[in-house]
A protein has these predicted regions:
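Terminal amphipathic alpha-helical/low-complexity segments used for targeting or macromolecular assembly
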Residues: 1-123, 184, 189, 195-196, ...
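Structural signal for interior beta-strand "rungs" in well-ordered beta-sheet cores
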Residues: 59, 119-271
Length: 272
């Protein structure tokens, strides 16, 4: 198996991503919880109870997993007050009212990706009339066509294509091989994972003299603030009128949103 991270030495620096660690007391303070047990224990990551090692934080959110909590090698366990009595008294722990709500804060600390450096990669192809906000990061082999507007802090990873007339808000993240079709509008803090296509023509044909004539799709694809779309998903543009995803919508991988669909705010869809 993989070796456990070496415990830190006095004065060790703590990089924001990779090799991070916290003492149990520091971890409890970060999440507004109570530390019990070995208060100087160093925690360097989060893992399931079954797979955790001495430097990992485990998670107990349901009494069904009390046996796993008793057998775990985790250095400490994140637990709620009503489940705390299920732990061995010697088990180090961080006690919080709602471990599920606390978990994102812990995961972001230990596993957050390093921020990309602002700048334009030398292999990127960018039209002359593109308007880029401050702090934009454009990766290798990105293509940005004419009349595109991108807000500040936006990141385009390798091989992204942004077609003409698209509008991207602030702090948008497009992962590798995303394609944004013409005249798409992305709100602020939108995240599109690898292989996503937005603004694609919908599936529309008309019978004409024994053949099928393609119906042009001329509507927009409008995606609200804080939307996240999973890998290899597609969102079609409207035929006449728009396709719209409201703010805070979350789509799983391999989801297809057809033309002229309206998805309300805070909707969550799992893959089919």
């Amino acid at each position: 198996m993989f070796p456990e991270p070496a415990p830190p030495k006095s004065g060790d620096a703590r990089p924001k991503s990779g090799g991070t660690w916290l003492t149990l007391v520091e971890l409890a303070a970060m999440v507004g919880g109570r530390a019990e047990g070995d208060l100087d224990k160093h925690i360097a990551g989060v893992m399931s109870l079954a797979q955790a090692g001495p430097s990992d934080l485990g998670l107990l959110v349901d009494s069904r997993y009390s046996r796993a909590a008793g057998e775990t090698a985790a250095g400490a366990i994140l637990v709620s007050p009503n489940l705390e009595d299920m732990l061995d008294p010697a088990q180090s722990r961080v006690v919080v009212e709602d471990p599920r709500k606390t978990l994102p804060t812990v995961l972001e600390y230990f596993f957050s990706d390093p921020l990309p450096r602002p700048g334009l990669h030398e292999t990127a192809i960018i039209a002359e009339d593109v308007k880029l906000g401050t702090g934009v990061s454009v990766g290798p082999y990105v293509v940005i066509e004419d009349n595109v507007v991108m807000g500040e802090g936006t990141t385009l990873h390798a091989h992204v294509v942004v077609r003409s007339g698209a509008r991207l808000g602030r702090d948008v993240t497009l992962h590798p091989h995303v394609v944004v079709y013409p005249h798409v509008r992305l709100g602020d803090r939108v995240v599109l994972h690898a292989g996503v296509r937005v603004g694609v023509d919908g599936f529309g044909y008309a019978h004409s003299e024994g053949s099928l004539a393609r119906i042009p799709h001329v509507g927009a694809c409008i995606i609200g603030d804080d939307v996240e779309i999973g890998a290899n998903s597609c969102v079609d543009r409207g035929s006449i009128g728009h396709t719209e995803l409201g703010a805070h919508v979350k789509l799983d991988n391999l989801v297809h949103i057809g033309h002229n669909v309206t998805v309300g705010p805070r909707t969550v869809m799992a893959a089919q």
